[in-house]
């Protein structure tokens, strides 16, 4: 039986957390699926050679090469092209706020399952006001566990719409060199 293709999309983010988490998930999936990481983070260029995982780079809207509306259409079209090319039936998005282009890809391809990898420890910023609506647009929400979870008093702390998992890390004790 052929392994299914799963697209793991990440936002650009400020650091490398979204991309590192998607990389760890992709490594864990390799035995069971064909993961493809799609990211707006420039660091994605190092992953294919290092991890043996297919990656696609999509320049983020922060590049300001086009208007926000055009970029959302561009993102939607790039994601849909990848879904059509690979036959993927599942796409995850790891980022604080799912871009309209990600949601539009799901709306355009209703059989595509959309999973939000939504970290906890949200700050009380304006994004929290659309949290409920964005959550309803997802087929599934995964919240990776965090060592500081006991100190999470943000807008996701009391929500019951996510499956909380163990923490997700690239570090694997059994493969560490020392």
List the predicted regions and their residue ranges.
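Structural motif
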Residues: 5, 89-92, 140
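Short catalytic-loop micro-motif centered on adjacent basic/acidic residues
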Residues: 36, 90-93, 115-117
């Amino acid at each position: 039986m052929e392994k299914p293709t799963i697209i793991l999309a990440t936002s650009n983010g400020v650091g490398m957390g979204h991309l590192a988490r998607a990389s760890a998930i992709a490594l864990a999936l390799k035995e069971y699926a064909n993961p493809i990481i799609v990211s707006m983070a420039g660091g994605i260029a190092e992953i294919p050679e290092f991890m043996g995982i297919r990656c696609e780079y999509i320049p983020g809207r922060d590049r300001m090469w086009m208007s926000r509306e055009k970029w959302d259409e561009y993102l939607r079209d790039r994601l849909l092209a990848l879904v059509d090319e690979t036959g993927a039936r599942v796409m995850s998005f790891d980022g604080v706020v799912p871009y309209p282009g990600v949601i539009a890809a799901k709306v355009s391809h209703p059989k595509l399952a959309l999973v939000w990898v939504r970290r906890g420890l949200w700050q009380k910023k304006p994004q929290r006001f659309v949290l409920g609506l964005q959550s309803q647009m997802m087929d599934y929400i995964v919240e990776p566990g965090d060592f500081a979870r006991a100190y999470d008093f943000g807008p996701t702390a009391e929500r019951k719409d996510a499956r909380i998992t163990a923490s997700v890390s690239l570090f694997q004790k059994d493969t560490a060199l020392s």
